[in-house]
């Protein structure tokens, strides 16, 4: 698929579908498509859940209200099972992370050529529709979690307690301060990196498989592989949203523990 209508080779087709709609260059490059889709999906989440909350009834609930209540209950039970402190932010944060990431992941279930083709009709040459397959998005979300970890670590333990945790753990002796600081710093920094890269890697791989199926097989045979993979991928997109949420809760629970 190309804007001029010529037939692309498999290699060109794959490269085209992996190219973002971008502005800027170098370090300051911004992936417009990832930004737009993530904001739109986040807005959709807020609008939908607020609409259900406003129209919620104590009588016989509708299907949408039942679904939202199930999601609320699932996230709330997960938070209570992991986070044992008292913090009004954790449950709403966990709900936002789970639903938002799930919606971004679910974009991978759309037909691979549908939205990019509509974009080309509108003279938009490139379009990637899965925000969570963009490492900039996943690492940005993980960085937000990292700042919360630092904030609550300092708030609960104080600056002195936080520094002591970095310098006196795991070896509680002044002679091991450099080793402790190195180990704890690596551990602390690895949390957001692993959190973001795990989500990115799984979603990028899933997107790549759909692209490879579309690029390598004739259209009439793609369904034989696309449908089974899409069904299996539903589990992946849900599981990755759940893992990101759970690890966020675990990290914040550790940050809020007093020593």
From Swiss-Prot:
GO terms for cellular component: plasma membrane; proton-transporting ATP synthase complex. It is a multi-pass membrane protein. Coiled coil: none annotated. It is found in: Cell inner membrane. The chain crosses the membrane at residues 29-49, 89-109, 132-154, 209-229, 230-250. Pfam families: ATP-synt_A. The keyword Membrane applies. Keywords: ATP synthesis, Cell inner membrane, Cell membrane, CF(0), Hydrogen ion transport, Ion transport, Membrane, Transmembrane, Transmembrane helix, Transport. One of its GO terms (biological process) is proton motive force-driven plasma membrane ATP synthesis. It comes from the Bacteria. CDD domains: ATP-synt_Fo_a_6. GO terms for molecular function: proton-transporting ATP synthase activity, rotational mechanism. SUPFAM superfamilies: F1F0 ATP synthase subunit A (SSF81336). NCBIfam families: ATP_synt_6_or_A, PRK05815.1-1. Belongs to the ATPase A chain family. F-type ATPases have 2 components, CF(1) - the catalytic core - and CF(0) - the membrane proton channel. CF(1) has five subunits: alpha(3), beta(3), gamma(1), delta(1), epsilon(1). CF(0) has three main subunits: a(1), b(2) and c(9-12). The alpha and beta chains form an alternating ring which encloses part of the gamma chain. CF(1) is attached to CF(0) by a central stalk formed by the gamma and epsilon chains, while a peripheral stalk is formed by the delta and b chains. Key component of the proton channel; it plays a direct role in the translocation of protons across the membrane. This is ATP synthase subunit a. It comes from Tolumonas auensis (strain DSM 9187 / NBRC 110442 / TA 4). The gene is atpB.
């Amino acid at each position: 698929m190309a804007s001029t209508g010529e037939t692309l080779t498999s290699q060109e087709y794959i490269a085209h579908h992996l190219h973002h709609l971008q502005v800027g260059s170098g370090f300051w490059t911004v992936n417009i498509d990832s930004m737009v889709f993530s904001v739109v999906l986040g807005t959709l989440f807020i609008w939908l859940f607020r609409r259900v909350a406003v129209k919620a009834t104590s009588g016989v609930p509708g299907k949408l209200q039942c679904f939202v209540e199930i999601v609320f209950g699932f996230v709330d039970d997960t938070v209570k099972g992991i986070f044992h402190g008292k913090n009004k932010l954790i449950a709403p944060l966990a709900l936002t992370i789970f639903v938002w990431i799930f919606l971004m992941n679910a974009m991978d279930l759309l037909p691979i050529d549908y939205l990019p083709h509509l974009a080309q009709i509108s003279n938009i040459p490139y379009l990637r529709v899965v925000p969570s397959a963009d490492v900039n998005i996943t690492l940005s979300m993980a960085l937000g979690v990292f700042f919360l970890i630092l904030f609550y670590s300092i708030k609960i333990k104080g600056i002195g307690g936080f520094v002591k945790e970095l310098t006196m753990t795991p070896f509680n002796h002044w002679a091991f301060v450099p080793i402790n600081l190195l180990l704890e710093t690596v551990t602390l920094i690895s949390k957001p990196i692993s959190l973001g890269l795990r989500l990115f890697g799984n979603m990028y791989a899933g997107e790549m498989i759909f692209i490879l199926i579309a690029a390598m097989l004739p259209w009439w045979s793609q369904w034989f592989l696309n449908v089974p993979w899409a069904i299996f991928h539903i589990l992946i997109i849900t599981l990755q949203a759940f893992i990101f949420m759970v690890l966020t809760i675990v990290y914040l629970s550790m940050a809020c523990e007093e020593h």
